[in-house]
Design a protein with these regions (language model features):
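Generic hydrophobic alpha-helical membrane-span motif
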Residues: 32, 88, 187-189
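Active-site loop-helix segments enriched in His/Asp/Glu that coordinate
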Residues: 39, 58-141, 151-169
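Short N-terminal secondary-structure initiator segments
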Residues: 1-2, 24-28, 81-94, 214
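Hydrophobic faces of well-ordered beta-strands that scaffold small-molecule active sites
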Residues: 21-27, 86-88, 115-122, 144-148, ...
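Alpha-helical hydrophobic/aromatic positions enriched in membrane-embedded helices and signal peptides
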Residues: 16-20, 74, 173-175
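Active-site gating loops and adjacent loop-to-helix segments of metal-dependent hydrolytic enzymes
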Residues: 32-67, 142-145, 192-210
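Histidine/acidic residue-rich metal-binding segments in metalloenzymes
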Residues: 6, 99-111, 129-217
Length: 217
């Protein structure tokens, strides 16, 4: 009988588990497993800004139990692959309100002995519009990191820099990190990484701010 040869994926996984396991620092577990064959064509023909709102259907129709089931499925998948720490954004906005984050905390309690879970609020509706700001403020007290998407407020109101101020103020006042989506459109006109660096210094948040995506650098 021929000796079994492990796949490269299995080899890498097993070696990393020996050294303490993976860290998944960026996920959207509340929306995991929601893609369908019918949606693929729609998403394929939509730009990123449109996708920010296309997910409203899932958010609007998902109950706490629905979110909880997706969190549990995501967490168990991470554990099965040797992930020992899992950071995920969680939608908290006027569409889904606090249903997703309530489910997230419920799941964290169940798996607290199996994996480290950290949450950041996802602000697809921005932080400038009053109702969006209300849910941002509520969500900021329910997460481990302040998440942000300044370009949403730049597109809608021309207030991307003001949105950064709100994000950094929220993080600083709570003594937690800030995790910001910037420069996602691969355009030389985008300067969000530089702007976020300037705002980080202005707010005295050096070493406590993460910029993610950054493909326009």
């Amino acid at each position: 009988m021929r000796n079994h040869v492990r796949s490269f994926k299995t080899f890498i996984r097993d070696e990393i588990i020996k050294k303490g396991g993976w860290v998944n620092a960026h996920a959207h577990a509340d929306r995991a497993f929601t893609m369908t064959p019918e949606k693929i064509g729609i998403y394929h023909n939509s730009n990123l800004q449109q996708k920010w709102d296309l997910v409203d259907e899932v958010k609007r129709t998902s109950s706490v139990d629905d979110y909880y089931a997706r969190f549990c499925q995501s967490i168990e998948l991470m554990i099965s692959q040797g992930v020992t720490a899992f950071g995920t954004f969680v939608d908290i906005d006027p569409i889904c309100e606090d249903r997703a984050i309530i489910a997230a905390h419920k799941a964290r309690e169940v798996y607290k002995h199996d994996i480290i879970l950290k949450f950041a609020n996802q602000t697809l509706k921005g932080v400038i519009e009053p109702e969006a700001r209300k849910w941002f403020d509520i969500g900021s007290d329910m997460v481990d990191m302040i998440g942000g998407l300044p370009y949403r407020d730049e597109l809608d109101y021309g207030l991307g820099l003001e949105a950064m101020d709100i994000l950094l103020d929220a993080a600083k006042s709570r003594g937690i990190m800030c995790h910001v989506h910037v420069d996602q459109f691969n355009s030389p006109k985008e300067k969000e990484t530089e702007q976020l660096c300037d705002k980080t210094i202005e707010h005295g948040m050096e070493g406590r701010v993460v910029a993610i995506h950054g493909i326009s650098i």
